């Protein structure tokens, strides 16, 4: 925690301000100092977890909206670890986790968004999506697997589908 307390890590540069237009190219992808993950976890997690618990209580009490948190990253980037270390501290009755891997036979028998819609959280609850419907577009476009995917025809030959 010493590095964090001395200000050797500037977490503000990783934050998105409310109503600010986001340009992901401007965000750094590497940390600027060598800091132990445990130090960061011990320094920030207790406060963040308490804030998340409070937000979850408010979301549940208002029962107006459901919240989706999408974790989109490459394999082994820490999506499962994030679910286990961050969201495991919330009330499990109000949190669901859906992992979107290759579509199952049942999912292929339905329209493109069926499996996503099926996983949406009810009002007052939080749904954590391990990957998203973008995965089907991103992976097939990047790895040239369109012929094996179940993409809508409007995306198959569109040059700006990933934009």
In which residue ranges do the predicted regions lie?
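Pre-Walker A adenine-sensing motif
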Residues: 54-60
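Conserved catalytic network of the ASCE P-loop NTPase/AAA+ motor domain
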Residues: 61-62, 90-92, 118-122
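Short beta-strand-centered segment that lines the nucleotide-binding/catalytic pocket of NTP-utilizing
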Residues: 94-103
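Conserved nucleotide-sensing/catalytic segment adjacent to the nucleotide-binding pocket
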Residues: 100, 107-151
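Charged, amphipathic alpha-helical linker segments immediately N-terminal to NTP-binding catalytic cores
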Residues: 4-46
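Glycine-rich phosphate-binding P-loop
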Residues: 71-86
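Conserved small/polar residues in nucleotide/adenosyl-binding loops
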Residues: 157-163
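Pre-Walker A (Motif I) flank of P-loop NTPase domains
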Residues: 64-68
């Amino acid at each position: 925690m010493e590095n964090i307390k001395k200000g050797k890590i500037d977490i503000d540069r990783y934050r998105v301000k409310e109503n600010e237009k986001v340009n992901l190219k401007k965000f750094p992808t590497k940390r600027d100092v060598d800091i132990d993950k445990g130090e960061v976890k011990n320094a920030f997690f207790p406060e963040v977890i308490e804030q998340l618990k409070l937000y979850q209580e408010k979301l549940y009490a208002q029962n107006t909206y459901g919240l989706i948190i999408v974790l989109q990253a490459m394999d082994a980037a820490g999506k499962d670890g994030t679910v286990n270390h961050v969201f495991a501290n919330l009330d499990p009755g109000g949190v669901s986790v859906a992992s979107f891997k290759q579509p199952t036979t049942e999912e292929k028998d339905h329209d493109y968004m069926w499996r996503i819609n099926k996983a949406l959280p009810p009002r007052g609850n939080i749904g954590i999506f391990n990957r998203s419907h973008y995965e089907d577009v991103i992976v097939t476009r990047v790895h040239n697997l369109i012929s094996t995917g179940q993409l809508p025809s409007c995306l198959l030959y569109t040059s700006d589908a990933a934009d």
